[in-house]
């Protein structure tokens, strides 16, 4: 039996993307910024983690189409409307329980394969930051791992 062991050095590159949101609920396409971080990393094969650094926001993959973004907001508002007296969490003095629920439904992060130095998307796929308690400074972690 012949066994081969291939050793290579794994590279890591971490960067935070910072931006301000204008609205309480907002969906922002961050694909270009993530691609910039990937290019700066020099990594050609691996994985790219994109992670919201806030408990009331989300990172997800979908299509860049305005009607679809409006549909997401409408659906999420139907699921967890802004209603301060509806949620027990808001008894703590907060008024953003609806934002926590929206984040849980939409997810915290995405991981995208890197192939040939590019994000390996399906047709129409883009990376979005979903803000559910906005109008302030926000951060997204991008961690690129590979060779």
Segments the model singles out, each with a brief description of its role:
Residues 2-147:
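Active-site histidine-anchored catalytic micro-motif
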